[in-house]
């Protein structure tokens, strides 16, 4: 089964949206196998967003993601990455369809409420930054 990482960013946590967002993913048939809340520090943010390091918005991104608590979750399921990306909507909430997380809940392109892995390969790396394998739970969903 494919796994993917979901982060509810500080704007989502601060507005009490973690539960709603996690529930939306479960309704897609994805199984929640790891969950934690944390305050991301600059070191972890730099590792997580390393592909964007050369981009002009990188510093602002790190400042934002470390500005408050986040919820980190791992979901598992068939085509988990694709399902979650579709449910999240476009990066810019103004361009996201209604019914998507960002279309319904995102504030702006900087405060777009969620992050999700963009490929199965990247998901493996991202998950390893936030969870050890022993923190991921295997169970039968009914």
UniProtKB/Swiss-Prot annotation:
CDD domains: NDPk_I. The active site is at residue 115. It is found in: Cytoplasm. GO terms for molecular function: ATP binding; metal ion binding; nucleoside diphosphate kinase activity. Keywords: ATP-binding, Cytoplasm, Kinase, Magnesium, Metal-binding, Nucleotide metabolism, Nucleotide-binding, Phosphoprotein, Transferase. SUPFAM superfamilies: Nucleoside diphosphate kinase, NDK (SSF54919). InterPro entries: NDK-like_dom (IPR034907), NDK-like_dom_sf (IPR036850), Nucleoside_diP_kinase (IPR001564). It catalyses: a 2'-deoxyribonucleoside 5'-diphosphate + ATP = a 2'-deoxyribonucleoside 5'-triphosphate + ADP; a ribonucleoside 5'-diphosphate + ATP = a ribonucleoside 5'-triphosphate + ADP. Major role in the synthesis of nucleoside triphosphates other than ATP. The ATP gamma phosphate is transferred to the NDP beta phosphate via a ping-pong mechanism, using a phosphorylated active-site intermediate. Belongs to the NDK family. This is Nucleoside diphosphate kinase.
